[in-house]
Amino acid sequence: MNSSSSTMNEEPDALSVVNQLRDLAADPLNRRAIVQDQGCLPGLILFMDHPNPPVVHSALLALRYLAECRANREKMKGELGMMLSLQNVIQKSTTPGETKLLASEIYDILQSSNMADGDSFNEMNSRRRKAQFFLGTTNKRAKTVVLHIDGLDDTSRRNLCEEALLKIKGVISFTFQMAVQRCVVRIRSDLKAEALASAIASTKVMKAQQVVKSESGEEMLVPFQDTPVEVEQNTELPDYLPEDESPTKEQDKAVSRVGSHPEGGASWLSTAANFLSRSFYW
């Protein structure tokens, strides 16, 4: 068995590898290739059992991205250890609440990929209720907030926004729609949207307004109060979970890895697969 310390100077460690896979999976153009690769999907499954919680969370984020592609779901569901590993993450008492919710969502997506009868639907609902029980009362439901962010106009600003949102305890996921300067954020029901605005305002270069729909269905921008809101911060800075496919056209590629190209992604997949085989197969 190779220790991570012996290879750290030569190869990236587990967290950097899984984070790179997560970033590659964020680009819709890479998702099929990652799932078809012989080493990446099994590696992500093994990462779900990693002792380092950020590695587990990042692996789940990558899987959630991959599951957004409907063509991937059957293969993912049938991959050896996938569903069992997701169950283990959900049921493990030491798993953080947001991580359990993320694993539960992936499980439900894959479990429902070929469901056609009522029994299967009931099984999925039962599964969701069980996951909610594990999450506790403060995590029963999540809500989605759509933000229009003035100043969100390049990758450096997006990175600033990511860092600000990742610090907020209760943020489950977010995805960017750069073409329209928007961010779709999924948060726990007990977190106020004003906390998101305060975090974004703390960057000093961006300001958020909430996007809401009127009774007639028209979108409106609602400004937040300028009064800062006290924000409970994460101590371990978990990663985020992507939302469902954006209603805007996919070519926006708002969540693409910076500088990613199909050929570059394929090259990096080879590097990642090589690392996974060296690290996990013995």
UniProtKB/Swiss-Prot annotation:
Residue list for modification N-acetylmethionine: M1
Phosphothreonine: residues bearing it: T137
Annotated transmembrane regions: none
GO BP: intracellular distribution of mitochondria
Biased amino acid composition, Basic and acidic residues: 246-255
GO cellular component annotations of the record: cytosol; mitochondrial outer membrane
Record's keyword terms, sorted: Acetylation, Cytoplasm, Membrane, Mitochondrion, Mitochondrion outer membrane, Phosphoprotein
Name this protein carries in UniProt: Armadillo repeat-containing protein 1
This protein's encoding gene: ARMC1
